[in-house]
């Protein structure tokens, strides 16, 4: 059951060959056994999870089930869930129990899914390695010495180690796709505005987007069918006709024009990653796809642009955490200003403080025009590069990350090297485009490599179809980490 797809689990549940209670108990037992080492989950609540499973079993018995009813899911700890500790990986929210559900959580609850727990993450989603969490680093299940990627490292680890059949993630500059690649699973960041951000704790509001993480593209399609939809509580939510992301999965891909940006295949990519990506592209050639060289000339500016805009928005968003209404509050203070200063100094970690300082600096008088406005102009140029590229191709492909997972602690003292982990993913984020990563093989030290697929706006169904066809002729997505398979 641990390796079953969501469709297979759905069939077993609907045919009453297993109950949701049995399935949930099996995953909870596995979490208990493996989580002390992997640290993928911050919070588990067996009683709550089993209560939800019991409700799901009743839904199935009454004939009121959906394709996802009874299936457990892990929620990234950035999503508010009523009655659950919701920490965002920070000391600042270490005692915060959410009084309401995020729309994403609410939609999965209504579909009858079971919340297995809240997964570990980089503090306030700021990080590329899941090392900035107040709750300690997450280990990569393929190699316990390696990082799982970030910021959705707990979710990626949970799916890869079969602690959960699916998980939610959030992506600001690559936080779904990068950990999906480094942990050998599938993950998709939809077009900005497709998935509601209501109840998803904000990092950079013009970039943040929730999305699913699972073993395969087919699983992602099933999850997106529930996740996507207009929400009037989110002012950036898009109102579009409902789409079924599973209906075109089997379409042939012959004649598909795949764009290969020359900038993505230049220096910076390690040879082991390059070899895996070349082999993946060869599979698409066999499937009948054609390749077109395209150019994204401003992509080299994506990381500096991202690290001006995202911290600027973060410095504003995180100003709400001051110890007054909720969250951590310093024990001793002499005035209101002292309360603010000590609470934020003690409650935020080093990386979060660094980004707040950068953001405050680029928004300050005298630097706003030089940094923030310039970055906004360059962001538009990056989006324009993609517009021109998509006139020549249907999809864009390349590596998700320049290297395989690095070792825990390797880049902690070098923020610039850490930030460059987002070099391929931040471009799509800045343009608001959908991007996904699927497992494509293994590089050095037998660590996973991800293939990055970028689609035009609202082309998630096409991306999932293209990924699914690849997964029908390869088995990378079915492999399990050796130390966690039993």
Swiss-Prot record:
<dbReference type="InterPro" id="IPR036928">
    <property type="entry name" value="AS_sf"/>
</dbReference>
<dbReference type="GO" id="GO:0005524">
    <property type="term" value="F:ATP binding"/>
</dbReference>
<keyword id="KW-0547">Nucleotide-binding</keyword>
<dbReference type="GO" id="GO:0006412">
    <property type="term" value="P:translation"/>
</dbReference>
<comment type="subunit">
    <text>Heterotrimer of A, B and C subunits.</text>
</comment>
<keyword id="KW-0067">ATP-binding</keyword>
<comment type="similarity">
    <text>Belongs to the amidase family. GatA subfamily.</text>
</comment>
<feature type="active site" description="Charge relay system">
    <location>
        <position position="151"/>
    </location>
</feature>
<dbReference type="Pfam" id="PF01425">
    <property type="entry name" value="Amidase"/>
</dbReference>
<feature type="active site" description="Charge relay system">
    <location>
        <position position="76"/>
    </location>
</feature>
<dbReference type="GO" id="GO:0030956">
    <property type="term" value="C:glutamyl-tRNA(Gln) amidotransferase complex"/>
</dbReference>
<dbReference type="GO" id="GO:0050567">
    <property type="term" value="F:glutaminyl-tRNA synthase (glutamine-hydrolyzing) activity"/>
</dbReference>
<dbReference type="InterPro" id="IPR004412">
    <property type="entry name" value="GatA"/>
</dbReference>
<dbReference type="InterPro" id="IPR000120">
    <property type="entry name" value="Amidase"/>
</dbReference>
<dbReference type="InterPro" id="IPR023631">
    <property type="entry name" value="Amidase_dom"/>
</dbReference>
<keyword id="KW-0436">Ligase</keyword>
<protein>
    <recommendedName>
        <fullName>Glutamyl-tRNA(Gln) amidotransferase subunit A</fullName>
        <ecNumber>6.3.5.7</ecNumber>
    </recommendedName>
</protein>
<dbReference type="InterPro" id="IPR020556">
    <property type="entry name" value="Amidase_CS"/>
</dbReference>
<keyword id="KW-0648">Protein biosynthesis</keyword>
<feature type="active site" description="Acyl-ester intermediate">
    <location>
        <position position="175"/>
    </location>
</feature>
<comment type="function">
    <text>Allows the formation of correctly charged Gln-tRNA(Gln) through the transamidation of misacylated Glu-tRNA(Gln) in organisms which lack glutaminyl-tRNA synthetase. The reaction takes place in the presence of glutamine and ATP through an activated gamma-phospho-Glu-tRNA(Gln).</text>
</comment>
């Amino acid at each position: 059951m641990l390796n079953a797809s969501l469709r297979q689990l759905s069939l077993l549940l609907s045919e009453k060959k297993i109950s949701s209670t049995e399935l949930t108990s099996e995953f909870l037992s596995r979490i208990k056994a493996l989580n002390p080492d992997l640290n993928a989950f911050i919070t588990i609540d067996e009683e709550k999870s089993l209560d939800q499973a019991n409700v799901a079993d009743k839904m199935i018995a009454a004939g009121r089930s959906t394709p996802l009813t009874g299936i457990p899911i892990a929620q990234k700890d950035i999503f508010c869930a009523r009655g659950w500790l919701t920490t965002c990986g920070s000391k600042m929210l270490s005692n915060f129990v959410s009084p309401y559900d995020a729309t994403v959580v609410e939609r999965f609850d209504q579909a009858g899914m079971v919340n297995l727990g809240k997964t570990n993450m980089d503090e306030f989603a700021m990080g590329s390695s899941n090392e900035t969490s107040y709750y300690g680093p997450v280990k990569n299940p393929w190699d316990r010495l390696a990082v799982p990627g970030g910021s959705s490292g707990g979710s990626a680890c949970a799916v890869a180690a079969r602690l959960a059949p699916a998980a939610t993630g959030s992506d600001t500059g690559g936080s779904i796709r990068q950990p999906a690649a480094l942990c050998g699973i599938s993950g998709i960041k939809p077009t900005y505005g497709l998935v509601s951000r209501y109840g998803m704790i904000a990092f950079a509001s013009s970039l943040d987007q929730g999305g699913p993480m699972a073993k395969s593209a087919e699983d992602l399609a099933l999850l997106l069918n529930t996740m996507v939809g207009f929400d009037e509580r989110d002012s950036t939510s898009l109102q579009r006709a409902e789409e079924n992301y599973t209906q075109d999965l089997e379409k042939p891909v012959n004649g598909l024009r795949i764009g290969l940006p020359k900038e993505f295949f230049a220096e910076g990519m390690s040879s082991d990653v390059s070899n895996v990506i070349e082999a993946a592209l060869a599979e698409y050639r066999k499937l009948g796809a054609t390749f077109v060289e395209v150019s994204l000339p401003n992509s080299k500016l994506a990381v500096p642009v991202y690290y001006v805009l995202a911290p600027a928005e973060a410095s504003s968003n995180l100003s709400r955490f001051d110890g007054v209404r909720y969250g951590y509050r310093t024990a001793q203070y002499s005035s209101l200003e002292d309360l603010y200063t000590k609470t934020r100094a003690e409650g935020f970690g080093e990386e979060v403080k660094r980004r707040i300082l950068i953001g405050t600096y680029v928004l300050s008088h005298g630097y706003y025009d030089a940094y923030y406005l310039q970055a906004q102009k360059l962001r538009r140029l990056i989006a324009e590069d993609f517009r021109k590229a998509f006139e020549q191709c249907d999809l864009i492909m390349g590596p998700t990350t320049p290297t395989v997972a690095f070792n825990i602690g390797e880049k902690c003292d070098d923020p610039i090297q850490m930030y460059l982990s987002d070099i391929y993913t931040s471009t799509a984020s800045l343009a608001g485009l959908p991007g996904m990563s699927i497992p494509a093989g293994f590089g050095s030290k037998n660590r996973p490599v991800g293939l990055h697929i970028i689609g035009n706006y609202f082309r998630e169904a096409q991306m999932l179809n293209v990924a699914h066809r690849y997964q029908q002729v390869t088995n990378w997505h079915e492999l399990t980490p050796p130390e966690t398979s039993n």
